[in-house]
Swiss-Prot record:
Pfam families: Ribosomal_S27. Binds 1 zinc ion per subunit. Keywords: Metal-binding, Ribonucleoprotein, Ribosomal protein, Zinc, Zinc-finger. Coiled coil: none annotated. A zinc finger (C4-type) spans 31-52. One of its GO terms (molecular function) is structural constituent of ribosome. It comes from Methanococcus maripaludis (strain C5 / ATCC BAA-1333). One of its GO terms (cellular component) is ribosome. Belongs to the eukaryotic ribosomal protein eS31 family. Its cofactor is Zn(2+). This is Small ribosomal subunit protein eS31. GO terms for biological process: translation. Zn(2+) binds at residues 31, 34, 49, 52. Part of the 30S ribosomal subunit.
Length: 67
């Protein structure tokens, strides 16, 4: 018999917003394909959407040459 799968815990969506007075600021980037309700995961060199698989690579901000 196969082992039973555990219950997945949902993420706490309130951690993705910052409220100051009457303004709300999103702390994570939203997916351009899925819309404003789906946030993208931030990795070392890219942003990824877990719902549709959209990838956006970060730009290298290294403009100076290392000596």
């Amino acid at each position: 018999m196969a082992a039973k799968k555990g219950v997945k815990t949902s993420t706490k969506k309130s951690d993705y917003y910052k409220v100051e007075g009457n303004t709300v600021e999103r702390l994570k980037k939203a997916c351009p394909k899925c819309g404003a309700g789906v946030f993208m995961a931030e990795h070392l060199n890219r942003f990824a959407c877990g719902k549709c698989g959209y990838l956006e690579y970060k730009k290298n901000e290294k403009t100076e040459t290392e000596e």
